[in-house]
UniProtKB/Swiss-Prot annotation:
Gene Ontology cellular component annotations, sorted alphabetically: membrane; mitochondrion
Topology with respect to the bilayer: Multi-pass membrane protein
Family: Belongs to the AIM11 family.
Lineage, highest ranks first: Eukaryota, Fungi, Dikarya, Ascomycota, Saccharomycotina
Transmembrane segments: 42-59, 88-110
Annotated keywords: Membrane, Transmembrane, Transmembrane helix
Protein name, entry field: Altered inheritance of mitochondria protein 11
Localization of this protein: Membrane
Length: 174
């Protein structure tokens, strides 16, 4: 047993009695479930920290570019030594950083709330939340219309090898 695994198991063993003492449902959960929820929490907290860093960076870069005129200088004309291309590049980069960090925070927070760890689980969760299983059962009970049955039979014939592509059914020689 490695040192990391030993420290993790001792950490988990100290956590379970605490959770059970205060009647948390998580106290009855398995170690894998607790580790999974911990990973989801760490992802969310990391993206939240990145969002805080990005917003602070955007604030500082905005304040540093603010035009403050001297005492007897007009406040309507910016200085002539101003580089608009650099300002635009910094604005695009800062906006992209803010958008990405806030989006990651929303996504990881939603996944933490919904207990989703991968794309397959996300698909299952969305299908069950939107009533996909019930609607699928209702659709399977409905009778199939004539055109859909014809297309389905044709596709089944192709998949089973019953259809000959060389023979098109028309007589070209006559």
């Amino acid at each position: 047993m490695s040192v990391e695994a030993a420290s993790n198991s001792s950490d988990q063993s100290g956590l379970k009695p605490f959770l059970a003492k205060y009647n948390f449902k998580l106290g009855e959960a398995s170690d894998e479930y607790i580790a999974r929820r911990k990973r989801q929490m760490v992802l969310f907290m990391s993206s939240a920290a990145l969002t805080i860093f990005a917003s602070r960076f955007a604030y500082k870069s905005t304040i540093s570019r603010q035009y403050i005129p001297t005492l007897f200088q007009g406040n309507h004309a910016p200085p002539l030594s101003y580089n608009f291309a650099t300002d635009a590049a910094v604005a695009v980069g800062t906006g992209t950083l803010l958008c990405g960090s806030v989006s990651s925070m929303v996504i990881f927070g939603s996944c933490w709330i919904l207990d989703v760890s991968n794309f397959k689980e996300f698909g299952w969760k969305m299908k069950s939340m939107m009533g996909g299983y019930e609607k699928e059962r209702e659709l399977s009970k409905l009778p199939m219309d004539e055109e859909s049955a014809y297309i389905q039979d044709g596709l089944n014939d192709i998949l089973e090898g019953k259809y000959d592509f060389d023979e098109d059914g028309t007589e070209e020689g006559k």
